[in-house]
Amino acid sequence: MSAVLKDAPRLELMRDGDLDEVLAVESIIYTHPWTRGNFADSLRAGYDCRTWRHGGELLGYFILLAAANEAHLLNLSVAARHQRSGHGRALLREAIDIARRRAARSLFLEVRPSNYAAQVLYTRLGFRRIAVRRGYYPAHVGREDAFVYAIALS
């Protein structure tokens, strides 16, 4: 089910106080969610951690690491009830804009082969699959590979 929003969502800096909401979203949409420690470490390290909110409601978020003329999108997530409503596309565009402002020449990300919807989104926004990381993700049984996608920003 998609929720229709009348006003535009806002991109905000993620803060420690957001982590309970972020973890609630993670636990619903992922079989192997990030931990509080993963998010807290990202905040402490100064990564670009953003939330996507409408009227105070958390719609999604991302974690972006930019360094040495490259950026790596570590996590981009949309709350289950807001998926397939354009929020993933909007968040990805925001992440690309931030990576450009950080002087990144390229942006990389990993995605599970089983996450076909995300792969379609990345391809539509100009990302190309460039590699496979074997056994990258934990899975119910064993490990799952990751497809590596990249986009040139300059």
How does the language model describe each region?
Residues S2-S85, R89-R102, G135, A152-S154:
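Acetyl-CoA-dependent GNAT
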Residues Q83, H87, N115, L121-L125, ...:
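ABC family nucleotide-binding domain
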Residues M1-S2, S106, R112, D145-A152:
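Conserved catalytic core of the tyrosine transesterase superfamily
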Residues E110, T123, R128-D145:
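Conserved catalytic-core motifs of GNAT/GCN5-like acyltransferases
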Residues L92, N115-A118, G135-H140:
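Short glycine/proline-centered loop/turn elements that form peptide/ligand docking sites
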Residues S77, P113-N115:
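Active-site-proximal loop/turn and secondary-structure-junction residues that shape catalytic pockets
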